[in-house]
């Protein structure tokens, strides 16, 4: 009887695991649990996506129980079903003097490819171990492979400025830019990066000073669009959209692009990235995090289509949607 019972349990467990591993998503369900192809919850918060050789790669914060554990990377051919690749950048568990020693805070990682050096370059917001949010630094790491492992290079305050929430943007001509919150989050700044993308240049300017963070930028035709959030800690707030025909400004405030229930609180989320969809003209996905400060691993993801029509941007709430619903922007 025991053998039969054990065999039954093993068989049932195998069926359950196979079911979890074979789950395939056919649509986006914003703010719902989102598992990877192994059946584990996706752990890639505050992240961004890069497209390489017919695959998307999603980099994001690996969150432990109250601690940063580095940067995870996942891959997908369809933006729905994500395979865990590896821990792309780990905290340093050997050298306690390292800027990324275990216990540090690593947030909002973004990766871009440098065509001149052949390296993938990662920037992230870094806070040093034991200092809370006082350090306000930018961290940089590189890899020859998109999935890593990434080698930590350095951390610093760009041109002497505090650097917290941030994103990277690579323009059509290959120039790259670092957009970051500064001066205790009162300022939002932009700096052009060096040719190797490893350092900021002296071309660094203030975009605006109205307490904005969580920058997410995209380009459509000749205009740049910048989505930001207010500064209310882990709590959601109202988004704003700015437009400019030059990255260094001037930027014009177009108001809140969110439409639908709870839109005044960005549907309960906070912006992190705007993803260009390959194969669709002017199609973008707005990426946001719905933070759960009591258990950051369980923070959810809100991905929604971005509509751009004659310069007007709308991000409308949808309970469920797929890429077929996306139309080319005008």
Each model region followed by its residue ranges:
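Bacterial Sec-dependent N-terminal signal peptides
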Residues: 1-22
């Amino acid at each position: 009887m025991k053998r039969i019972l054990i065999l039954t349990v093993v068989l049932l467990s195998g069926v359950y695991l196979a079911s979890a591993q074979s789950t395939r998503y056919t649509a986006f369900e914003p703010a719902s649990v989102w598992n990877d192809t192994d059946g584990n919850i996706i752990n890639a918060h505050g992240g961004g996506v890069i497209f390489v050789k017919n695959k998307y790669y999603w980099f994001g914060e690996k969150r432990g129980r109250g601690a940063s554990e580095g940067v995870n990377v996942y891959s997908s051919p369809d933006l729905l079903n994500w395979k865990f690749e590896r821990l792309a950048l780990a905290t340093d568990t050997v050298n306690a003097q390292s800027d990324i020693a275990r216990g540090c805070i690593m947030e909002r990682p973004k990766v871009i490819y440098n065509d001149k050096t052949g390296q993938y370059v990662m920037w992230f917001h870094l806070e040093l171990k034991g200092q809370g949010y006082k350090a306000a630094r930018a961290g940089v790491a590189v890899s020859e492979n998109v999935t890593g492992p990434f080698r930590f290079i350095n951390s610093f305050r760009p041109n002497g400025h505090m650097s917290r929430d941030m994103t990277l943007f690579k323009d059509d001509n290959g120039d790259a830019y670092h957009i970051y919150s500064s001066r205790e989050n009162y300022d939002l700044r932009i700096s052009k990066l060096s040719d190797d993308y490893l350092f900021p240049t002296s071309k660094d300017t203030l975009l605006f000073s109205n307490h904005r963070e969580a920058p997410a930028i995209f380009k459509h035709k000749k205009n740049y669009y910048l989505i930001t959030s207010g500064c209310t800690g882990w709590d959601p707030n109202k988004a704003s959209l700015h437009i400019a025909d030059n990255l260094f400004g001037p930027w014009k405030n177009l108001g809140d692009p969110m439409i639908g229930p709870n839109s005044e609180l960005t549907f309960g989320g906070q912006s992190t990235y705007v993803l260009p969809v390959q194969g669709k003209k002017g199609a973008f996905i707005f990426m946001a995090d719905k933070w759960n400060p009591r258990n950051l691993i369980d923070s959810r993801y809100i991905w929604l289509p971005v509509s751009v029509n004659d310069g007007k941007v709308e991000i409308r709430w949808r309970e469920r949607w797929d890429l077929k619903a996306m139309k080319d922007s005008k």
